[in-house]
Structures are given as structure tokens and as C-alpha cells.
């Protein structure tokens, strides 16, 4: 009897131990599955920057390289100019983006400078002999010229020399950002060190008012600048077309249109009536 009791007790202990092992194994498997599920959930790829941005006639191909990081990037690139594989390495996409910013700034200055003499002349703020349409100031010699202190050819050579020097310095900074702050330049080199981004050098010379003090405001200002720059480039193109078609300046065109919209508009100027 004692022997049977010992055997029974041993069997019960063995069964209990087996049960604990089975239950423990299942619990361990369950925990492992849950843990592996959590790991898989955490490995979800992040959302691309600018994924929810506004798009203008974007294609699947353009969105493969225009990811919204550049200011004013709406995925619009019908000619594939910014495609790093479409140019065969001949044109660097970063250079195109940089060039758009620079040309936009020149266009904004040009658009304002071309129309300002007309407006100031009409308002009587400057003499009439200097209130000329932009194409009569010497930029297009056959259309007329103003009597400056030197002839047009001398002025052209001088402008080319000055602009060539400025553009050379700008290209040096593009090739090696910050290099202009290391070269002597009339004591101004401290303000030419830049920010590391050639398109937005900042500093006391290029951002004296300290705009864009935080990342959010800087991003908004970059977007506004590129939009206005693109508009200004279109305006300059419009100035050229107006000059060829109407023979008067943009401000005079506006006054003529407001005075008689029916007979002075795009269609009548192009003889589509």
C-alpha cells in the first residue's frame, strides 16, 4: 500500500510538472507572437516628406524625384528637367533649383525696375526725359536710347565686367559653400560666409532684418519668394511681348486697357477680332 501511494504521488507530481511545462510553453509562444507582432508594427516605413502637398499636373515619374523638399515643389515637371536620370548627368537638378531662385530674384528686380520710371513719370515725380519705357533706355538700341555719361558699348562692357565678377564669386560659393568668407574682400568677408546653403546665404549682408528666425517661418518665406519669382519671370516675358506688339510700356498698356477695355486687350492687340 505504501508503495502504491508513493507511485501514485510520483505520477501526480509528474503529471503536474508536465502540465506546467505545456502551459508555460503556450504562454511563452503567445508572448513571443505578441512581441513579434509589435516589432512588425514598429517597422512601418515613415511617410515621405511633403506627401500631402498640393500637386500641379504631377506624374508618377516626376514624383519619384520631386518629393516636396524644395520650396515651391508641386511635382510639376512635364519636360523632366529635374529628373536626375533624364539629363545623363549633363544638368544637375540641384543647380536647376538654385538657378530658379536666382533668376526669380533678378526677375523681381527687373519687373519692378522696368515699370517704375513709367509710373513715377506719370505721377510727376521724375522728369519726363527720364520717364522712359524700359525698352527705350538702351537695352534695345533700335527702340531708342537715353544719353548716359558713356556710349552703349562702353556701358555694356562695364556691366559685363561687373556682373561677370559677381557671378564668378557666386559660382565659387555654389561649388564650395562658405568659401567666400575665407577670402579677403574689402573687409566684408565676415558677412559672406553664408549659411551653408548657397541659395539662402543669410547673414548681415543678405538678411539684415533677420527674416526667417525659425524653421517654419523660413519655409513659408522660401515658398513666397519662389512663387513671386516665377510670377516675375512671366511678367518680364509679358513685358517683351507687349513691347513688340504694342510699342508702349507695360504701365501705359494698363492705362489704355482700363480706359477702353473693349478695344484695348490681348485679342485686339494681336488682331484676333
From Swiss-Prot:
The record ties this protein, via SUPFAM superfamilies, to:
Chlorophyll a-b binding protein
Positions annotated to bind chlorophyll a 5: 224, 242
Primary location: plastid
List ligand-binding residues for chlorophyll b 3. 167
Listed binding positions for chlorophyll a 1 are: 76, 82, 100, 230
Q: NADP: is it a keyword of this entry?
A: no
Name a single GO cellular component. Answer: chloroplast thylakoid membrane
What does the entry's PTM section describe? Photoregulated by reversible phosphorylation of its threonine residues.
Q: Which protein are we looking at?
A: Chlorophyll a-b binding protein 8, chloroplastic
The source organism is: Solanum lycopersicum (Tomato)
Amino acid at each position: 500500500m505504501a508503495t502504491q501511494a508513493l507511485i501514485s504521488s510520483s505520477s501526480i507530481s509528474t503529471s503536474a510538472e508536465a502540465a506546467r511545462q505545456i502551459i508555460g510553453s503556450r504562454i511563452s509562444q503567445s508572448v513571443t507572437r505578441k512581441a513579434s507582432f509589435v516589432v512588425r508594427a514598429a517597422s512601418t516605413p515613415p511617410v515621405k516628406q511633403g506627401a500631402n502637398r498640393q500637386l500641379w499636373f504631377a506624374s508618377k515619374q516626376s514624383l519619384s524625384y520631386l518629393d516636396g523638399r524644395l520650396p515651391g515643389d508641386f511635382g510639376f515637371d512635364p519636360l523632366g528637367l529635374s529628373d536626375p536620370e533624364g539629363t545623363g548627368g549633363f544638368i544637375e537638378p540641384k543647380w536647376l533649383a538654385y538657378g530658379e531662385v536666382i533668376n526669380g530674384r533678378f526677375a523681381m528686380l527687373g519687373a519692378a525696375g522696368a515699370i517704375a520710371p513709367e509710373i513715377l513719370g506719370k505721377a510727376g515725380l521724375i522728369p519726363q526725359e527720364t520717364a522712359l519705357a524700359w525698352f527705350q533706355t538702351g537695352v534695345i538700341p533700335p527702340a531708342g536710347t537715353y544719353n548716359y555719361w558713356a556710349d552703349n558699348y562702353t556701358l555694356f562692357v562695364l556691366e559685363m565686367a561687373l556682373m561677370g565678377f559677381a557671378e564668378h564669386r557666386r559660382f565659387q560659393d555654389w561649388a564650395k559653400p562658405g568659401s567666400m568668407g575665407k577670402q579677403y574682400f574689402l573687409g566684408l568677408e565676415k558677412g559672406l560666409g553664408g549659411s551653408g546653403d548657397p541659395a539662402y546665404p543669410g547673414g548681415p549682408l543678405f538678411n539684415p532684418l533677420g527674416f526667417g528666425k525659425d524653421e517654419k517661418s523660413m519655409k513659408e518665406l522660401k515658398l513666397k519668394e519662389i512663387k513671386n519669382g516665377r510670377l516675375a519671370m512671366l511678367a518680364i516675358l509679358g513685358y517683351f511681348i507687349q513691347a513688340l506688339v504694342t510699342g508702349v510700356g507695360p504701365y501705359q498698356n494698363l492705362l489704355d486697357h482700363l480706359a477702353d477695355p473693349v478695344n484695348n486687350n490681348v485679342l485686339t492687340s494681336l488682331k484676333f477680332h
